[in-house]
Amino acid sequence: MAMSTNRIGGAIDKGVGAAKEAVGKATGNARLQVEGAAQKAKGDLQNKVGKAQDKARRRDQALNARL
């Protein structure tokens, strides 16, 4: 079963956000740190939405299999 595009996009945003945050910390760039933290949070939320979509899809498939 394929993962939802929200899960994939969320994982990408979390990774990019973590990298931005780390570079911001290493260079003392507070703006980049904040942008990275925000992008990580956005990615985490998007990933959770994707997980919920996948769970709903699996339930629908299970119900349809019983019919």
From Swiss-Prot:
Stretches the record annotates as Disordered: 37-67
InterPro entries per the UniProt record, alphabetical: CsbD (IPR008462), YjbJ_sf (IPR036629)
Compositional bias per record (Basic and acidic residues), positions renumbered to this chain: 41-61
Similarity section: Belongs to the UPF0337 (CsbD) family.
Protein name: UPF0337 protein CC_0938
Biological classification of the source: Bacteria, Pseudomonadati, Pseudomonadota, Alphaproteobacteria, Caulobacterales
